[in-house]
Amino acid sequence: LTQGYAVFDDPSMPVVGEGEEEPNDTFRKQLVANAKAAIDAVDELGYIDRSKVAVGGHSYGAFMVANLLSHSDLFAAGIARSGAYNRTLTPFGFQSEERSYWEAPEVYYNMSPFMHADKMKTPLLLIHGEADNNSGTYPLQSTRYFNALKGLGANVRLVMLPRESHGYAAKESILHMLWEQDQLLENYVK
């Protein structure tokens, strides 16, 4: 807030199932509703300018960021670090999704930001460790998503951090990540 904008950094937004529905059957709808409720609550307190709110996340949080930006106009920019953007590349389940791709193909498709790259209208910073060995978030996830977004004319930047895995450890990498995030926020949110 001291810089003139707000960032929802890795917010917790629960997605639940009701009755016979699995939680991910209505993932996008619940995710957007949760984000809107959070922004509404902070706005009601008088703390924010709704046009100057960004969202950021790491891993599953990055996946949520990409979905929020593709399916809402709530945010001025997004930061997605080491995420999974094409759920068909994790066909035997992920996080709370226990069904395989072949049991719930529409869920995998609907939850994959890659499949909705044409809807991205918000500036997005993708950051990924070149040596990410997390089976769901190999660097391929970010490079392919970046190529799709760029090919469709989206405002996107990809930063690959040398010799970094899923979490970043080198001081240089952390400082560079912070600088990249600051540049995005200064240019598109402030």
Where do the PLM segments sit?
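Serine-hydrolase catalytic core recognition
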Residues: 1-190
